[in-house]
Amino acid sequence: MQGTVDGFSYGLITPITAFLMAGLGGALGLRCTVRSLHGGRTFKAGWLALGAAAIGCGVWTMHFVGMMGFSVAETAISYDVPLTLVSLAVAVVVVGIGVFVVGYRGTGPVTLATAGLITGLGVAAMHYIGMYSMSLRGEFAYDALLVVLSVLIAVVASTAALWAAVTVRGFLPSLGASAVMGVAVTGMHYTGMSAMTVHLDGHGSRLAQGGSMTTVLLPMLFGPLVLLLVVGVIVMFDPLLVSGEDTWNGTRERRAGHRPRARHAAPAPVAAPRPAAEEEFWPRPGAPAPADGPASRYPDSYGTR
């Protein structure tokens, strides 16, 4: 018997919220990556790690917000806590690998393709590990074509996100790139969801065990949401993260070209020109002594010298 699968139990609330979570994580991750490229090598690894955590948590939060709208009419659904945590770790780690590769090696074709492939496969793995963490009275079956399509979407979205992380500058371009990332990652999630069917059985080969959505998913979403909030506060209080490279460069140029003048500095004294007669009889200090000869002798009150 095939179960009645509904991926939109709460209407458009869950897909819109999922998109916002993915876009938020992408936006914060992009800003942190921009900051790492202009803050020197001392804190570069820290900024890249913070950006990877933001993007990974955003993707994972998007996935499980979408899962809240998933239901099967004929059976209850529960979630395996360890597998759910594994899916979160996979999301953060694979995004971190991609971000660090492009952060240190740039976006050359080979580097970008390799990092995008690793990250995309990791995001797809996160999705299907999260799906497997569900327990219900039945078995899952997947449409192979849609599964392959969802993986391709994940790889393309990850490659585009990594390229944008080290290329896009400015607040509005980053906002647009984050929106595209949110659409792509959310589209990957719902493509993977549409690939799944549930075959119910009376023997309960996948008996519902673990925690329900309210007892497992909602508390587990708290941690990633707090992390996104912390990263958002950091971004708000660092104008270089918000404004991007242009403002950063402008600030450096202004600082390099600005030299404060001393207050109340007295003007340098200017020597008055000496009278011609005095110049004739009393040469300037440092001037060569006149040669000894008739032209160098002159009369004064003491006689001719």
Mark where each language-model region is.
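Peripheral, non-catalytic segments of secretory and membrane proteins
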Residues: M1-R305
